[in-house]
Curated annotation (Swiss-Prot):
It is found in: Cytoplasm; Chromosome. Acetylated. Acetylation at Lys-12 decreases DNA-binding affinity. The gene is albA2. The keyword Acetylation applies. InterPro entries: Alba-like_dom_sf (IPR036882), DNA/RNA-bd_Alba (IPR013795), DNA/RNA-bd_Alba-like (IPR002775). Keywords: Acetylation, Chromosome, Cytoplasm, DNA condensation, DNA-binding. GO terms for cellular component: chromosome; cytoplasm. This is DNA/RNA-binding protein Alba 2. The modification N6-acetyllysine is found at K12. Gene3D superfamilies: Alba-like domain. The keyword tRNA-binding does not apply. One of its GO terms (molecular function) is double-stranded DNA binding. The lineage of its organism: Archaea, Thermoproteota, Thermoprotei, Sulfolobales, Sulfolobaceae. Pfam families: Alba. Belongs to the histone-like Alba family.
Amino acid sequence: MTEKLNEIVVRKTKNVEDHVLDVIVLFNQGIDEVILKGIGREISKAVDVYNSLKDRLGDGIQLVNVQTGSEVRDRRRISYILLRLKRVY
């Protein structure tokens, strides 16, 4: 699966703080909107990343949209969540 420049797919190999740092780096590079994607068991980790970002940045971050759904992978349905975050100046 190809990732967009502003999309971060939450994976089990990285911890929550690494994903938080990735989002902050993207914001510091000038990207105003980032999409966090949690797939399957990593849905709760994606929500944890958002909550940690909200704790660190406070009102500097805004949750624009939350989208849930499922996609077919290897003939199985896998749930996902998309969290669209926007940097507020």
